[in-house]
């Protein structure tokens, strides 16, 4: 899973950042963006993207990534910002902001197929989290952070099973919306299955 990084290092790049997001599709909660920079000669220890891992495996790798990464940067995009810009624009804007706010001076960003502003030196990769261990690491960080946020929201909104469906468009979630109405963390620009006048 490090062929992309190996190729870029052979071309003379010294510092590569991987960036990814979690929470593009849910009806509620934030979009979480994470970027990760590993030392140049870090041996890959992630062999699949976050979707192919159990929650326990993600939690383990979350800690391991923190142990080995040179820098990790996390951006939380609230549902109000998603409603304001639209999910695709919000992802693009806040990914760019995340990369610009990194403390390290990096050479190129690997992105899981999001085209960023041309002023940012980046390489959009189809299924990037499956072929780049740096993107895969960012994917795991974003997913774990978002899941933890949604578990906390379960305490705040006990009528919603945010600890289980994490805000995604499940049958259970739609039933909860129908019964209890929408919460302040629901994305009003998404189809919530209710008329909100």
From Swiss-Prot:
Annotated localization: Cytoplasm
PROSITE patterns, A to Z: RNASE_H_2
Domain of life: Bacteria
EC top class, as a word: hydrolase
Documented EC number(s): 3.1.26.4
Xref: InterPro entries: RNase_HII (IPR022898), RNase_HII/HIII (IPR001352), RNase_HII/HIII_dom (IPR024567), RNaseH-like_sf (IPR012337), RNaseH_sf (IPR036397)
Coiled coil: none
Residues that, per the record, bind a divalent metal cation: 20-21, 112
Keyword entries, A-Z: Cytoplasm, Endonuclease, Hydrolase, Manganese, Metal-binding, Nuclease
GO molecular function: manganese ion binding; RNA binding; RNA-DNA hybrid ribonuclease activity
Residue ranges occupied by any RNase H type-2 domain in the UniProt entry: 14-197
Pfam name, any one: RNase_HII
A cellular component annotation (GO) from this entry: cytoplasm
Reported cofactor(s): Mn(2+); Mg(2+)
Cofactor details (free text): Manganese or magnesium. Binds 1 divalent metal ion per monomer in the absence of substrate. May bind a second metal ion after substrate binding.
Annotated CDD domains: RNase_HII_bacteria_HII_like (cd07182)
Catalytic activity: Endonucleolytic cleavage to 5'-phosphomonoester
One GO biological process term: DNA replication, removal of RNA primer
Similarity annotation: Belongs to the RNase HII family.
NCBIfam families: PRK00015.1-3 (NF000595)
Family matches, as HAMAP family: RNase_HII_B
Function (record text): Endonuclease that specifically degrades the RNA of RNA-DNA hybrids.
Protein name in UniProt: Ribonuclease HII
């Amino acid at each position: 899973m490090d062929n992309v990084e190996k190729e870029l290092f052979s071309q003379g790049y010294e510092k590569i950042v991987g960036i990814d997001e979690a929470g593009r599709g849910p009806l509620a909660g934030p979009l979480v963006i994470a970027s990760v920079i590993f030392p140049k000669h870090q041996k890959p220890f992630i062999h699949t993207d976050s979707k192919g891992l159990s929650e326990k495996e993600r939690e383990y790798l979350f800690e391991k990534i923190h142990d080995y990464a040179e820098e990790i940067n996390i951006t939380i995009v609230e549902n109000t910002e998603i409603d304001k810009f639209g999910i695709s624009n919000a992802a693009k804007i806040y990914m760019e902001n995340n990369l610009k706010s990194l403390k390290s001076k990096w050479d190129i960003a690997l992105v899981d197929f999001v085209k960023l502003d041309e002023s940012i030196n980046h390489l959009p990769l189809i299924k990037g989290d499956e072929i780049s261990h740096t993107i895969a690491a960012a994917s795991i960080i974003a997913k774990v952070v978002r899941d933890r946020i949604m578990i906390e929201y379960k305490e705040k909104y006990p009528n919603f099973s945010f600890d289980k469906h994490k805000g995604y468009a499940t049958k259970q979630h739609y039933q909860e919306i129908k019964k209890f109405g929408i919460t302040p963390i629901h994305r009003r620009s998404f189809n919530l299955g209710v008329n909100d006048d």
